[in-house]
A protein has these predicted regions:
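Predominantly extracellular beta-rich ligand-binding scaffolds that present long acidic/polar faces
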Residues: 53, 66-72, 76, 103, ...
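C-terminal outer-membrane/trafficking sorting elements
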Residues: 545-621
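Acidic Gly/Asp/Thr-rich repetitive segments characteristic of extracellular carbohydrate-active
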Residues: 23, 27-59, 497, 583
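Extracellular beta-strand solenoids
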Residues: 26, 58, 69-70, 83, ...
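Bacterial Sec-dependent N-terminal signal peptides
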Residues: 1-22
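Surface-exposed loop/turn segments connecting beta-strands in extracellular beta-rich domains
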Residues: 65-66, 84, 89, 93, ...
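Extracellular beta-strand-rich solenoid/capping regions of secreted or surface-exposed proteins
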Residues: 50-53, 64-82, 90-145, 159-173, ...
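Surface beta-loop-beta hairpin patches that serve as ligand-binding interfaces in beta-rich domains
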Residues: 497-543
Length: 621
């Protein structure tokens, strides 16, 4: 059992600062009677003794139960909690207790009008027992801000009580997350994270994050759309949300009623919305729903402005057991004539996103499925590879052979079509489908079904070919490549394949260049044109793959000072993130460089010695 249960009430509000910033230490071997120094640490987080702007350093695993209540009446406006060792963790119960089903009284943190920073630490093993509030581990009110950097969030569960939203986090305020893993979390709405608008617009940023094995479950919520969003549930009118270099892996929307939607994300847009949601350089793989939409279920608003953007992403083997699309679904019973905005889909690679994989056979499934738009809504579809009907001929059971299952993209243009701009060019796809009424004019389907228009815009179909024929013609791998660092991707493997240099090199849309100049790994564009999809073949990569590794110069990092030392003077040194992006200015003729301001993570040091030899070292900061 837990060896500590304590009650802490922390009142935080926007009042004057009463004390200078301090640093306090916490250890399971300490005592709350101690002054909280490194030599004499506290035993608990000891919130009654915090000061505004203080930093709490957790040295090992500590328990937290019940919640640190952030009420409106206190003097503290900002607190930072960070790990001081690799073992540092805040937990509700230990691993054995969690696996045995032991539950907790409440959440970890309840933020009201405060800024909380969590760094270099693990939050784990909280199964909330009842309660009326949202957020399994953390609730963020509309006037608060939560920042996570290099955090592991594991086993946050909320499936009992009222408002079972966000197994890890429910945010109604500002949320900024970097280098963070959400794993094994579960809730009725938003297995890992719930983003809701109440009094202020939603603002959220996710960079270098992993959402893995999160799921929906049974439960209740006072309002909303039911069980949805294996990784995230998003609901509101106004929102600004962006995902960059994130990996959505094996998240599931499931519940007893089997109507859960959005294996990865449920995007619920309320009326008169103003929404901007962006995905760049992300990989979405093996997500599943039992209701509808393997990755994203998008509930459109009938009035408002919506801009969804997908650039440089990989979508692989996402699927649903329900009646709608395996990747993205947006269905309405009537055309959304009052909704304006855009759906931008550029340089993405989409493969095997249908139920005709892994032993599941259906003949009417699609990767993307949209119903009638009707309003001033733009559809931008450029430089994509969509090979989602990747099934050899099979017998349906009645002797009928089916050689293609579903479509890559299906859109209904029967009752109306979008009156916005269509930019549809340089795509390779194994089929588009849907309902089309020619009296509405040249819509999305017209750009593919009219042979002259398709040829003029370089939109090529490979429907009717076998799987091996498609892969060979495109010159692309069948499976994900999993690098040592960074997110998985699908690799172009043939310099003579159709994908090479067949993309648009530049596209200015509403004053913005849409064509990415680097691929999903950070590899720069080679030649005058981007390759199709999210991968650039044979590009110049600023990563360990470019470098020789027989190092004669030794590298030493002083973790206290943030100074990187070399055993001898080097001609030049450059540093890159694990995604191949430069992170400090190049230094010449040096014996050390200062990397104190770099965030914690894995970096590649590229060194040129005095003899001109080039090699690399990996370091962990």
């Amino acid at each position: 059992m837990k060896n500590l249960f304590y009650s802490m009430v922390l009142a935080l509000c926007w009042q004057s600062n009463l004390s200078a910033q301090e640093t306090f230490y916490v250890s399971s071997s300490g005592s709350d009677d101690n002054p909280g120094t490194k030599e004499q640490p506290w035993y608990s987080l000891n919130a009654d003794n915090w000061t505004d702007g203080c930093t709490i350093i957790v040295l090992d695993e500590i328990y937290l139960d019940p919640v640190i209540d952030v009420s409106k009446e206190a003097t503290i406006k900002e607190v930072t909690i960070k790990g001081g060792s690799p073992e540092a963790a805040i937990m509700g119960v230990n691993d054995d207790e969690f696996n045995d089903g032991e539950m907790n009284v409440s959440s970890f943190f309840d933020l009201k009008r405060v800024k909380l920073n969590l760094e270099d630490i693990t939050l784990k093993n909280l199964h909330r027992d009842g309660g009326t509030g949202s957020g399994g581990m953390i609730y963020v009110d509309p006037y608060s801000e939560l920042n996570l950097n290099n955090v592991v969030v594991r086993n946050g569960v909320v499936t009992t009580g009222v408002n079972c939203r966000g197994g890890a986090i429910c945010s109604e305020g500002k949320l900024v997350v970097k280098n963070t893993i959400f794993e094994g979390c579960k809730a009725y709405q938003g297995g890992a994270v719930c983003l809701r608008e109440s009094e202020n617009p939603i603002y959220a940023r996710f960079e270098d994050c992993i959402f893995r094995n999160n799921e929906t479950g049974d439960g209740v919520a006072e309002d909303g759309s039911g069980a949805a969003g294996g990784a995230l549930y998003i609901e509101g009118m106004e929102m600004d949300i962006a995902f960059d270099k994130c990996y959505f892996d094996s998240n599931v929307a499931t519940n007893t009623a089997r109507n859960a939607t959005g294996g990865g994300i449920r995007l619920f847009l309320n009326e008169e919305c103003n929404a901007n949601v962006t995905f760049m350089n992300c990989t979405v793989a093996n997500n599943k729903s039992v209701g509808a939409s393997g990755f994203m279920h998008w509930a459109r608003c009938e009035q408002g402005n919506v801009n969804l953007k997908f650039v440089n992403n990989v979508f692989y083997k996402n699927r649903t057991e329900g009646p709608q699309a395996n990747l993205i679904t947006s269905q309405k019973s009537a055309p959304t004539v009052g909704m304006s905005g855009s759906f931008v889909f550029v340089n993405n690679t989409s493969m095997m996103n249908n139920t005709g994989v892994d032993g599941l056979v259906q003949t009417d499934q699609n990767a993307i499925n949209f119903s009638d738009f009707g309003g001033d809504f733009d559809l931008v579809f450029v430089n994509n590879i969509m090979l989602d009907c990747m099934i050899e001929p099979i017998d349906k059971g009645d002797g009928t052979m089916v050689d293609q299952l579903g479509w890559g993209w299906s859109i209904r243009e029967k009752d109306a079509r979008s009156k916005g701009e269509y930019i549809i060019k340089n795509n390779l796809i194994d089929g588009v489908g849907g309902a089309y009424d020619a009296t509405w004019g040249a819509g999305f389907l017209y750009h593919f079904n009219n042979e002259d228009i398709a040829t003029a815009n370089n939109n090529k179909s490979v429907r009717g070919k076998s799987t091996d024929q498609k892969l060979k013609q495109v010159g692309i791998n069948r499976k994900l490549t999993e690098p040592t660092e960074g997110i998985p991707y699908i690799e172009i493997n043939d310099p003579e394949g159709y994908a090479i240099d067949n993309g648009v090199s530049s596209l200015i849309y509403k004053g913005e260049e849409l064509i990415p100049q680097t691929d999903i790994r950070g590899v720069a564009k080679t030649g005058n044109s981007r390759d199709l999809g999210a991968f650039e073949y044979n590009g110049v990569v600023s990563s360990v793959n470019e470098f020789k590794v027989d190092s004669q110069v030794h590298v030493y990092l002083n973790h206290l000072t943030g100074i990187l030392y070399f055993s001898e003077e080097v001609a030049s040194v450059q540093m890159y993130t694990s995604f191949g992006m430069p992170c400090i200015p190049s230094a010449v003729n040096v014996t050390s460089v200062n990397i104190q301001n770099l965030e914690k993570g894995i970096y590649i040091v590229r060194i040129v010695d005095k003899n001109g030899k080039v090699y690399s070292e990996k370091i962990l900061k």
